[in-house]
Curated annotation (Swiss-Prot):
The modification N-acetylvaline is found at V1. This is Hemoglobin subunit beta. Red blood cells. Residues 2-146 form the Globin domain. It comes from the Eukaryota. GO terms for cellular component: blood microparticle; haptoglobin-hemoglobin complex; hemoglobin complex. GO terms for biological process: hydrogen peroxide catabolic process. InterPro entries: Globin (IPR000971), Globin-like_sf (IPR009050), Globin/Proto (IPR012292), Hemoglobin_b (IPR002337), Hemoglobin_oxygen_transport (IPR050056). Heterotetramer of two alpha chains and two beta chains. Heme b binds at H63, H92. CDD domains: Hb-beta-like. The gene is HBB. The modification Phosphoserine is found at S44.
Amino acid sequence: VHLTGEEKAAVTGLWGKVNVEEVGGEALGRLLVVYPWTQRFFDSFGDLSSPSAVMGNPKVKAHGKKVLNSFSDGLKNLDNLKGTFAKLSELHCDKLHVDPENFRLLGNVLVCVLARHFGKEFTPQVQAAYQKVVAGVATALAHKYH
């Protein structure tokens, strides 16, 4: 991902304020609610029968935190996203058979959740920088797909 110095500063500056547990759980939960077909990858998570069940599900929250911890690793390695996410790409492709489009959807949901959490601090410039990052992460996660 090519970010200017200003964009990198905006992304990392805001990310330092992110509660990965809260934002991760909300982002993954919203993905599962808004795009219900993504739930098929989470059969072992128990009750996903309604929006409130999804948003209150402890396994959704825990996996959302795990996802954002990986995203944090990506932010530390913006110049090597493919390398950073190679193993996760392989896992999601070969073992889990996740549709790579879901990575793009989750990235867009994450941007919306960040906007909701940070309000005016999530300026159009910050949003544009985050859109670049989530697109780069989605591309890196889809890298092992044929």
